[in-house]
Every structure is written in structure tokens, then in C-alpha cells.
Amino acid sequence: MVPVVALVGRPNVGKSTLFNRLTRTRDALVADFPGLTRDRKYGRAEVEGREFICIDTGGIDGTEDGVETRMAEQSLLAIEEADVVLFMVDARAGLMPADEAIAKHLRSREKPTFLVANKTDGLDPDQAVVDFYSLGLGEIYPIAASHGRGVLSLLEHVLLPWMDDVAPQEKVDEDAEYWAQFEAEQNGEEAPEDDFDPQSLPIKLAIVGRPNVGKSTLTNRILGEERVVVYDMPGTTRDSIYIPMERDEREYVLIDTAGVRKRGKITDAVEKFSVIKTLQAIEDANVVLLVIDAREGISDQDLSLLGFILNSGRSLVIVVNKWDGLSQEVKEQVKETLDFRLGFIDFARVHFISALHGSGVGNLFESVREAYDSSTRRVSTAMLTRIMTMAVEDHQPPLVRGRRVKLKYAHAGGYNPPIVVIHGNQVKDLPDSYKRYLMNYFRKSLEVMGTPIRIQFKEGENPYANKRNTLTPTQMRKRKRLMKHIKKSK
């Protein structure tokens, strides 16, 4: 399960700045969900290959009345469901009563908490953080988030050791087989056999969507009609339910995010939908079913979820629920809206179903298997290079500064999602339009459906870069004569 890190603190202590630093390689998801404050930010970050979800909880206004009465509900939820909390304080402003109230609340929750003193630029860090030791949260980590100073140290000395201690796990290098095959083909050898067989593993299927779109009904319909072996297996964290099942002699694991347990004083509105649970389900899944309510249409929340799914590279099947009972005119309007707002998602199958009555539910699994097979299929270097060559023959790369961009060869760089790595000269200057052309050409040639495909470009190295030619004795004498001539002419 992907760990969750919550940024907590008073307003204007630099939480959003640190959030942007941590998620610099990812597009933050801005969510506006019922029961949660507007513009709450969720993003994916990475430290030494270990991914985690980062939450900007917004400002918590702790007062003498007690932090629980003044803390926003979404911030309470984020703290409760986070694995670790980075409690941020303002080193310039010094210790405030609100800081003490928040620290008291965090101590009562017994969450792993690290105290981060921001805005230490221009100050003596040791002197600036002295007052904050009275909060009783242990060591203080000074940073300057706006300039990035101390952020890397925070990641390496705080988050990374914590992630290793709490969730030690061996990360399978899914790209190893591709690189072994590529190197073997380059050396004229046979690639070693890979023991990993995606068909032997169950397909992890996450059902996500806004509240009341029919996720629970769809889950119950799937389990109630076609289950062979079903039992509830609580997830390792945050009560996500993993439900193994079998259909058409194929094993699946449904990741159920519909049931969110009540926690403390969190209201029912917030309880209905946990953004954190949904993001973790997407990260952990092979295929995601995005459920949309046909009667309400596509909302900004749906598009936000869709954006996170695309950034995660997960296979996708779009499910339009509550299709029954709609007039033909309304159905046509819904389809037009889908085409208009989701026209850029040309790789995903769209199913119109009624989870309540079961119509169209059975056809979902055909698209799920298709998407999973597309995302995990192995493709040889020879085939990818051949497809790239055909694409170049059909449409030449543009000229850059009078020279034609040259694409040399392509090989696989990973799967789920499929990654194609293209090597060449001046590839960094390729326009986005040509990159999209190559992506669509590979998708069509490989018949990839249900999963995004990513193209990565690598510049060929100049073998003469940073190297100086050794002059022969004759060249040395000629150079001396030329230098004498130049000096005389001056």
C-alpha cells in the first residue's frame, strides 16, 4: 500500500510550498469533493524510487477553545488516515498558541510525527528553533521550502528511513526482463527467460467514483452473480477491503473503497468518500473502473479522479451507471457530453450499465481483461524498432536548425503502463505534435486498448564529448609555427 504523508500546521507556514516541492515531478490533484474543503490538494511524490501520497491539509486554526473544535473536518480526516505527519511551524513567527494546540492534538493521536521548522532562510537555524522544543515532539528539522534548502535532507533522513521501517518490502523490478532482453539482442544472444507471468497473477480491480454513483451496488452485483470464492480480507491499512473472486477461470481481487468506517467526530458527509482511500486503491490496482452517474453527468470531481488515474498510468474502463430509465433523448445528450468532455481518452472502453438491475455488468470483464493484457504484454526490441521505422517512413521527423531529427531504435522500458523508449539524435527538440503522432502510431500498431502508452526519448551520447585529440609531433610543430605567426601579426 502506498504510504500517506500529511502536511499539518497553521495557515501560512509554508505547507503548500513544501507540497509543491515534494510533488515537483507530478501534477497535483485538486479535489472538490462533498464534505471536503475546496481546493484540497493531493499529489504523488517520490524519494529514491519509493512513492508516497502527499496531502496539503490547509491551515488549522487552533485556539484556546481547543484544536478539535476549530480544526477543519478534512484536516482531521487527513491526520486520521495518514501514516505519518509532518507538523510545520514558522521559524520567523516563533512559537504560537495555535502550534501548542495542534501539537497537543497530534500527541493524542499517537501518529508518527516529525516537527519541521520552515522559513529558516537568513536565520541561524539552531537559534530559530529553540522555542519549538517545548512542544515535546523530539528533533526539529529546519528547512527553507521556498528555496528548497533542507528538503532533500528531510526526505533522506526522515521520510525514507521511516518508510523502510514501517513498510519494508522488496520492490520487484518489472523492467529487468526488458533490459535483459534488450542487452541480449544487442549482443546477439538469447534473452533469459523471465519467471514473471502476468497471466498467473490475479487482476487487481479498483472501483472508484464520487459518492452515490453506484460503486457499492456494482460491487455487490459482481460478487452476487458470479462469485466462486469470496471472503473479506481487511487491507493492511485504512480498512480497504480486498475481495478475491473468480470469474471465467480468471482470478480477480476487487478493491472496495465504498465502505469507509466512521472515525470519531467525522461527519457522515466526509465519511462517504475518502480521497485517500481512492488514491491508494488506484495506485494498488492493475485496472480501474471509473464509475460515472449518467443522471448527473461528468463533474469536475470525475475529471480530477480521471487525471490521477492517467498520471498513475493505470488501465482504465469507464462505467456510466444508472443508464436504465433514461429516455432516448437524454441518452443521446449524455453520449454527446461524454464525447465532448472525454474525447481525449480514446483508449478506454465505455460501458453503459445498470448496476441495480445488472444490465451490461457482465460485459465489463471482457474490457478489464483486454486492458490488463494490453498493459502487461511483452514486445520485442525488433518489433518496436520496426514499428518506429514504419512511422518515420510514413511521416518524417521535422527539421531542427536545418538538421533532420534522427530516430535510431526503440525498445520496451516497462509495462503497466507500456513504456516505449526511443533513442536518437536531437530527440529533445521533437515537437509535441510529433510525439503524439508516434504514440498513436505505436498504439494502433500494437493494438493497445484500455491502457495509456508512454513514449520516452533518450538522446544519443556523443563519443567525442569532453575529449581532446592528442596531437602528433608534426601537428605540435605546426601549431607552434601558427602561434608565432599570430603573435607577430598582433
Swiss-Prot record:
Organism: Salmonella paratyphi C (strain RKS4594)
Transmembrane segments: none
Binding-site positions, GTP 1: 9-16, 56-60, 118-121
One of the GO biological process terms: ribosome biogenesis
Any Pfam family hit: MMR_HSR1
Protein name, entry field: GTPase Der
Keywords assigned: GTP-binding, Nucleotide-binding, Repeat, Ribosome biogenesis
Domain EngA-type G: 3-166, 203-376
Family membership noted in the UniProt record: Belongs to the TRAFAC class TrmE-Era-EngA-EngB-Septin-like GTPase superfamily. EngA (Der) GTPase family.
InterPro entries: G_ENGA, GTP-bd, GTPase_Der, KH_dom-like, KH_dom-like_a/b, P-loop_NTPase, Small_GTP-bd
